[in-house]
């Protein structure tokens, strides 16, 4: 996926989870943060950030904050990007997929993707990962009851004879492995292990990231 007309800035502050104040060429500019997670380890005063012009007519903020430099490591923090890059990658991930259907209603939830195969359905829930420490990627960075619910829906899918995958898009390149963040949300880690034991495929992929683009690159080991 590609962004157009990306500009560079320096993060100053985050008044709330939706906006940030960024220095762009010496001018303080209020920007939209495309990630409502905490991101405390990323958005620190003085951090180098990248922004894409907003395209929605009538919006109040001229830019979306999409990427940040963390100690020399470029991290995409656009919460919409993981689904976009998986949509581009889906047929490489599952070569038997004949149709890629986003936002698929299943049970009491709307899962991110349904891949239609000759032998049935392959349901995929995508999660973006921006939390990293010492090369180890972790999810989530804040408690997510919605994420736990999605894992239970994937278990139900397997019980009904479907294929199911929890797909973690690590929004950076330089990571060695992925694991659930039990310190932040033990229930999510427990649900992920339960899903894996039930037959849900749990995978994580690192990405190639530049200020103006991101694409899925390679699988990384999942530690449960």
Whereabouts are the PLM-identified features?
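Short aromatic-glycine-enriched beta-strand elements
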Residues: 16-21
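Nucleic-acid nuclease catalytic cores
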Residues: 135-145, 152-184, 206
């Amino acid at each position: 996926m590609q962004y157009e007309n990306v500009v560079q800035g320096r993060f100053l502050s985050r008044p709330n989870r939706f906006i940030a104040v960024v220095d762009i060429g010496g001018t303080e500019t209020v920007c939209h943060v495309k990630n409502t997670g905490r991101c405390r380890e990323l958005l620190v005063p003085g951090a180098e950030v990248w922004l894409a012009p907003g395209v929605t007519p009538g919006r109040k903020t001229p830019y979306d904050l999409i990427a940040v430099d963390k100690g020399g490591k470029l991290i995409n923090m656009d919460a919409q990007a993981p689904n976009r890059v998986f949509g581009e990658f889906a047929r490489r991930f599952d070569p038997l997929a004949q149709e890629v259907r986003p936002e698929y209603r299943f049970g009491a939830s709307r899962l991110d993707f349904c891949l239609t195969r000759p032998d049935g359905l392959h349901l995929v829930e995508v999660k973006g990962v921006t939390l990293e420490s010492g090369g180890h990627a972790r999810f989530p960075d804040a408690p997510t009851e919605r994420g736990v619910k999605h894992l239970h829906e994937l278990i139900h899918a397997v019980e009904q004879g479907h294929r199911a995958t929890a797909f973690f898009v690590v929004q950076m390149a330089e990571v060695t492995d992925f694991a659930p963040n039990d310190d932040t949300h033990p229930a999510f880690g427990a649900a992920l292990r339960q899903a894996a034991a039930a037959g849900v495929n749990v995978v994580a992929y690192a990405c190639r990231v530049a200020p103006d683009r991101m694409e899925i690159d390679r699988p990384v080991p999942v530690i449960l």
